């Protein structure tokens, strides 16, 4: 079984049974996504080692890596590729959503963040996709802290470039809510308590608008990733144009990626 961390179970990026619109089967066991890895021990660490990971592609900022460094793994290359600015846009958004002195934000703001990955921050992701589409680095695991926002965006783009239809890609993205169900429930309680303390009220008195913001932060929503996919369509018109002109992935690199992942 996939190993579990205290934050997010590892997931093979490509679930068994995924197919492209051309009817090709997507291979599993080559790309994985996860949250932070430092808490793994015992059987979970053994399971991670059994995956034969060759490359870890870390999307976190240096401060996140320092707080939760990678475990020692023999023969594994760690590629640091922070996709966040020093201001860490998502953390700023998260803090604003939970700040009692600010206007409550909601799911639309996270969807706008995802769209901005394509319209405003794509340059930070180009090296990520260049690495993730290199079969010479497989098996490859890419991770962030929560394993759902930065990695969820990358996973969705990788699948759509392969030709998996949008509905299936969104279904795959939403699995993060399933595998993180217990963790989400625990964090919702913590968020409610934190908001209550900051407002000077009891947990049962927290306004629904604040709880909506909390749930939006902790859960995946189809509208989040769809916003990014729509931005690709709006800006480039096709996945081939986006791959070539937006991400700068050459025809030869993309052909090698397809050959490795499709059967």
Predicted features by range, described:
Residues 1-6:
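Short, exposed "boundary/linker" segments that immediately precede the start
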Residues 147:
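Substrate/cofactor-recognition hotspot
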């Amino acid at each position: 079984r996939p190993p579990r961390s205290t934050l997010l179970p590892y997931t093979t990026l490509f679930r068994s049974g995924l197919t492209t619109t051309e009817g090709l089967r997507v291979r599993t066991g080559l790309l994985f996504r996860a949250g932070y890895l430092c808490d793994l021990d015992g059987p979970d660490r053994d399971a991670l080692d059994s995956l034969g990971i060759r490359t870890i592609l870390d999307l976190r900022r240096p401060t996140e890596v320092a707080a939760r460094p990678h475990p020692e793994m023999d023969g594994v290359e760690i590629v640091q590729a922070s996709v966040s600015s020093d201001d860490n846009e998502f953390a700023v958004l998260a803090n604003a959503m939970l700040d009692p002195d600010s206007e409550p934000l909601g799911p639309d703001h996270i969807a706008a963040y995802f769209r901005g990955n394509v319209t405003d921050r794509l340059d930070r992701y180009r090296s990520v996709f260049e690495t993730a589409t290199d079969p010479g680095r497989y098996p490859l695991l890419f991770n962030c802290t929560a394993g759902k926002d930065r990695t969820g965006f990358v996973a969705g783009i990788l699948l759509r470039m392969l030709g998996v239809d949008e509905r299936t890609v969104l279904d795959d993205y939403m699995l993060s809510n399933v595998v993180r169900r217990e963790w989400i429930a625990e964090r919702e309680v913590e968020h409610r308590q934190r908001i209550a303390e900051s407002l000077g009220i009891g947990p049962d008195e927290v306004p629904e608008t604040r709880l909506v913001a909390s749930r939006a932060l902790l859960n995946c929503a189809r509208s989040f990733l769809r916003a990014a996919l729509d931005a690709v369509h709006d800006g480039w018109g096709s996945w081939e144009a986006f791959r070539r002109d937006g991400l700068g992935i050459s025809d030869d690199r993309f052909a090698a990626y397809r050959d490795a992942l499709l059967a």
